[in-house]
Amino acid sequence: MILSEDFVRKYDKRIINIHPSLIPSFCGDGFYGLHVHEAALKRGVKITGATTHFVNEITDGGEIIMQKAVEIKEGDTPEDLQKRVMEEAEWKILPLSVEKVSNDMISKR
């Protein structure tokens, strides 16, 4: 666990994380940075992507907000894949997720 249970409970559904895979694949303890992309390439999956989710007491275990798929190309290195996932997925869905969560919070007031 990265943040304490008390902290994530206090800010329930107000902390967003972005993870460089399509959760539930390649997530949880030990899956961060290039490790995620190395695991996807080693497994031989054809599609990966990024997921935004709310943070809870389980690493990468919170409610999913948004996902975007990215194709894995023949000859990809972990670094190639990391760059493509950031550019094609992470950088697109993070601002959209923040906007969605903000709008949902405002509409519930």
Name every feature range the model reports, one short phrase each.
Residues 1-107:
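Donor/substrate-binding cores of folate-linked one-carbon enzymes
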